[in-house]
């Protein structure tokens, strides 16, 4: 199995990226009632026509997409409705609750009407679901993939196709930051000066002491640690110190042997930023076990916080919060600084995590209908418009021109960061994390730590031990 995500290639796609036209389905109905015999004949004709229509619809197939991201459910529902109205092909979108995708997929895939399109999160996901992944090497959508090395491959087959290049970091409200820079004796006077952890920490702690003056409840939005709501920390944040560990030790991420164990040598750096989040927040650490991602994003949107860790996909959440006070031009990104040597040249975390797969156990007509739907989504004018404006994706396909890029501020700022001279993006290495169980256990440990019932040394040991245990479990 091969999965090669190279930052240079991802950056190239980010810089060059920004949906066959819809088929109109029409039907006419003619009714006539004269004699009883004619009526009977008409009824027979109608019955035959209905049967023929049903048979034709069955041959055309149907689509059942099991979506991974709750924040994009509304967009996918609208896209599905648009496609069905245009083509007559039924498209059902079901969205798993946050943090439950693996369990939901396991349950749904066993049903008679199983998902025809599902998602995996990289090589580890493929290892779990390869028996259900159809070979897409001959598909039109794979042909349009700008960088074929981004796909999930096994031998000569292609089993997972990436559909978006995304980025995450610390999102900040520039209006609040500008207000802070004008206070008495600020620890920095511009965002350009905040390019390492030491400066970030000084600024954040000073802002927290001036929270009332700045009109905020805390510098950072609440660190959501409710079960299923902790992925920003046990996956995205943990990626940063492990990225440096793999890089510094020249670990071959494509080698199973090379990633059997980790040292977690940058544990202190993880603690640096995690403690900064916890201690300068809207919510006290002991209460974080009930906080959701939506709660956290709402705090930012309502101007209660100045910063929040999340990705470019989060702008849809921010902009739709009732009472939102943050102007689009004030929503910007900065890297997640942790105190690593040379981090002044570190950029955002940019990569791809989720891949479309077609269920090879589904009826052939449903597999075809599902591929047709994805092809429409990423090649037709209507589909591409939905990808850009509704989903906000930067798509890795050659069907998108330079002008077909999301216009929301976070996508635009992500593109700007990826093109900065002398700045290196952090790769998404969490696609090789051992399992969802590993992530869940790390998340639970982080909550226990936040509540003061676990030491950081214990957290670090758990990360190392759980990594080794889950790598061994998934290999067996």
Question: What are these regions, as identified by a protein language model?
Answer:
Residues 127-131, 150-190, 201, 223-255, ...:
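Periplasmic solute-binding protein
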Residues 204-205, 248-290:
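Glycine-centered hinge/linker elements that transmit conformational signals in sensory
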Residues 86, 90, 111, 322-392:
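Extracytoplasmic/periplasmic substrate-recognition and gating elements
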Residues 47-53, 57, 121-178, 330-337, ...:
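Hinge/lid segment of periplasmic solute-binding proteins
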Residues 60-62, 86-95, 113, 183-192, ...:
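A local structural motif
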Residues 11-15, 26-125, 138-141, 365, ...:
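Conserved N-terminal structural module of periplasmic/extracytoplasmic solute-binding proteins
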Residues 350, 393-395, 399, 412-471:
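C-terminal capping/gating helix-and-loop segments adjacent to ligand/active sites or protein-protein/ligand interfaces
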Residues 77-81, 99-135, 144-160, 170-171, ...:
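Pocket-flanking alpha-helical
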């Amino acid at each position: 199995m091969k999965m090669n995500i190279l930052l240079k290639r991802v950056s190239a796609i980010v810089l060059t990226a920004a949906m066959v036209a819809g088929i109109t389905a029409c039907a006419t109905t003619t009714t006539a009632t004269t004699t009883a015999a004619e009526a009977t004949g008409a009824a027979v004709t109608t019955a035959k026509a209905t049967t023929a229509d049903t048979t034709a619809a069955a041959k055309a197939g149907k689509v059942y997409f099991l979506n991974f991201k709750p924040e994009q459910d509304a967009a996918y529902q609208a896209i599905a409705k648009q496609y069905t109205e245009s083509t007559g092909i039924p498209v059902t979108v079901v969205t798993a609750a946050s943090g439950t995708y693996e369990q939901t997929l396991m349950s749904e895939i066993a049903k008679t009407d199983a998902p025809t399109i599902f998602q995996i999160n990289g090589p580890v996901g493929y290892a779990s679901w390869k028996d259900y992944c159809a070979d897409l090497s001959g598909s039109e959508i794979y042909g349009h993939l700008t960088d074929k090395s981004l796909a999930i491959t096994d031998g000569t087959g292609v089993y997972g196709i990436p559909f978006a290049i995304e980025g995450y970091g610390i999102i900040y409200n520039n209006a609040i930051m500008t207000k802070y820079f004008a206070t008495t004796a600020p620890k920095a006077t511009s965002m350009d000066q905040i390019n390492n952890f030491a400066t970030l920490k000084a600024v954040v702690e000073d802002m927290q002491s001036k929270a009332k003056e700045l009109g905020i409840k805390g510098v950072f939005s609440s660190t959501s640690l409710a079960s299923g709501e902790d992925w920003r920390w046990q996956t995205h944040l943990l990626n940063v110190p492990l990225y440096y560990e793999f890089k510094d030790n020249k670990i071959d991420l494509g080698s199973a042997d090379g990633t059997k164990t980790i040292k977690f040598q940058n544990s202190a750096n993880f603690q640096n930023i995690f403690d900064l989040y916890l201690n300068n927040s809207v919510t006290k650490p002991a209460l974080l076990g009930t906080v959701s991602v939506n709660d956290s994003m709402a705090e930012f949107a309502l101007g209660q916080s100045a910063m929040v860790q999340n990705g470019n996909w989060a702008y849809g959440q921010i902009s739709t919060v009732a009472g939102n006070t943050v102007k689009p031009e004030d929503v910007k990104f900065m890297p997640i600084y942790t105190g690593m040597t040379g981090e002044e040249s570190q950029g955002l975390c940019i990569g791809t995590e989720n891949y479309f797969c077609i269920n090879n156990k589904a009826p052939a007509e449903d597999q075809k209908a599902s591929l047709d739907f994805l092809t429409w989504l990423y090649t037709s004018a209507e589909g591409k418009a939905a990808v850009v404006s509704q989903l906000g994706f930067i798509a890795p396909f050659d069907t998108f021109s330079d002008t077909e890029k999301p216009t929301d501020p976070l996508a635009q700022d992500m593109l700007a960061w990826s093109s900065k001279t002398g700045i290196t993006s952090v790769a998404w290495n969490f696609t090789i994390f051992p399992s969802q169980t590993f992530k869940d256990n790390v998340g639970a440990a982080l909550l226990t730590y936040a509540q003061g019932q676990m030491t950081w040394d214990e957290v670090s040991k758990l990360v190392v031990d759980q990594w080794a245990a889950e790598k061994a479990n998934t290999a067996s």
